[in-house]
Amino acid sequence: VYTNPLPTNWGSDRGLTDPRSVNVKIQHSFIQMPENQYQPRFEDVRVGYFTTQVTDMTTPDDATPYRDLIHRWNLVKKNPDQGISEPIEPIVWWIENTTPLEFRGAIQEGVLAWNKAFEQAGFHNAVQVKVQPDDAAWDAGDIRYNVLRWTSSPNPPFGGYGPSFVNPKTGQILGAD
């Protein structure tokens, strides 16, 4: 015999009545993939990259029909005929407003030091750094912004971790934290 008893907890605007419960807020963000002239690059196993694996079915006899696309930013020169040019769209990093004031200058200096490497690749001022305003209308978790976050931990890991999200078809970095 099948029975379907009525629920005994009809809910509340104050959350669940069970003291073992926790409220969790979840947000899903969707973005449209860019339509541009970005050219994917395949991994060279001699160099370490973050990669996205894609299946390549164009060679039927290939025992390993997959390729690894490297994750990289889509930097395009404003002036392609110049040796060094500013990019059309620079990589903009935001220092989260919760970062202690005494560390912000050093963090900004460290990030901007990457411009030296980008100059070797032909880009001037490829990386910019801004500080999230205290009254920002956007959250540090907003995927439209590349945010350097400050976290405190009793057991801090060595260094940092920089997750990014990419176009799965090309490996183009669309954003990062």
Label every PLM stretch briefly.
Residues V127:
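Conserved structured catalytic cores and adjacent interaction surfaces
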Residues G105-E109, A113:
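Extended non-catalytic domains of envelope/secretory-pathway proteins
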